[in-house]
Amino acid sequence: MKKLLFILAFLTTFSAFADSVSWLRYPSISPDGEQVAFSFKGDIYIVDSRGGLSRQITTNMAYDYAPVWSPDGKTLAFASDRSGNFDVYTVSVHGGVPKRVTTHSSKDTPWAFTPDGNNIFYF
């Protein structure tokens, strides 16, 4: 009986690890709390905060990460190395072609939008 319980516990634990998403990173909650943007395997996704299927926002060979919501919830800023080094880009939450915001030779990562949504703080 102890052996059976041990095997059952092992299989339950093993299956829990198999379902974990180890590549999901940099979660960012929308201003209204209804959505979560995140980085997964180098692209940006959005999912409903209550769960469900995610929508892919960026698709490319580059590494996109650190999404940040604009105050109105219509735009995401994120870092990407699609131009050779990490710069800040913006994209509509509905997808589309990202717009490059910074062109520095150093690594730029967005931190937040200004309250009016016209500028982005980055480091």
Feature annotation, model-predicted:
Residues 32-35, 45-49:
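Blade/loop signatures of beta-propeller domains
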Residues 18-22, 48-65, 80, 91-107:
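Multi-bladed beta-propeller domains
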Residues 4-13:
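Sec-dependent N-terminal signal peptides
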Residues 21-36, 61-79, 103-123:
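Conserved beta-propeller blade repeats
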